[in-house]
Amino acid sequence: MSVVAIMIHVADVEAGLLWYQRAFPSAKRKSIAEPFFEYLDLDGTSIEIVLADEKVASGAAGSVAYWYVANFASALQHMQSIGATLYRGPAEIEDGKRMCQVRDPWGNCIGLRG
């Protein structure tokens, strides 16, 4: 098994797509014609930016996906430079690696690990 998609709930889908494209510069914007839907493809994992609603609001409320980063300090600095705020950590983990969580402009958590 592997993760194929991460759904991120935001108040403004277009703003969310633009922000996450900046957060993950190697992600490619793709679309489906019927029904029309845009998403980001990051090495085969879909980052699906969808409208928050009464069932699922944006913000920190549960599971967090952690992205492997080759240079932890650089990745954290990049996220903060585009408006993410540090939420938890950084913490030292096994094998000399570090991990943290940052929050996007809608309050959703993004985990970094490397």
Task: Set out the residue ranges of the language-model regions.
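Vicinal oxygen chelate
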Residues: 3-11, 30, 39-41, 56-114
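Core segments of cupin and vicinal oxygen chelate
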Residues: 1-2, 7-47
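A short alpha-helix capping/helix-coil boundary motif
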Residues: 15-17, 53-57, 78, 111
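Short secondary-structure boundary/capping segments
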Residues: 29-30, 38-39, 55-58, 92
